[in-house]
Amino acid sequence: MNGQGRLLTHFLKNADKLVIPVYQRNYDWKEEHCKKLYSDLVKTIRDNKRWHFFGGIVSVSDPMGSSSDYLVIDGQQRITTVSLLLLAIANLIKDGLVTPNDPNLYDVITKKYLVDEINPKQRKMKLKPIKGDQDAYDRLWGDPSEYNFSSRITQNYLFFYNQIQREDISVDQLFTAVEKLQIIDITLTPPDDDPQLV
């Protein structure tokens, strides 16, 4: 087991795929958790903080995938929530509802943090939630009339989508705050570490 402090965005960027194992629970963060994260990000911007600690992420290389595919053992709620926030920013830009100062921000977010760059034309998403959440997450990439509104995935995505439009901070500032999220990245080494015992 190896642990090191690093930025969450480095963790996301260096992974081709982040798989939530079938034995994990469904995504269950409530809106209050998203409000807290959003408030922390805004405070990071306003206080000009160098970083904001965001907890630990425990992962192990996926034996069924490439060396850059990881099973997320602990931290799936945080990874999923940040992915929803990033997708909300990207979709707001795509929908023309916000205009970033950086004209490349949409591509930076989608290609580095949301989509597997090796297969961008096939739109292979980096995050692979468990089956109960996968459909709701996939629908967020398409027509809003097809969203699964009963899913927490969708509800929290919509919270971010709407909140960003109400704030007086720019999406560039918000993305910069996301880049300041610091994690403890704990990587398990099989067979010594059993992911199901963590």
Question: What is the meaning of each model-derived region?
Answer:
Residues M1-L197:
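Glycine- and hydrophobic-rich flexible loops that cap the catalytic core of alpha/beta enzyme folds
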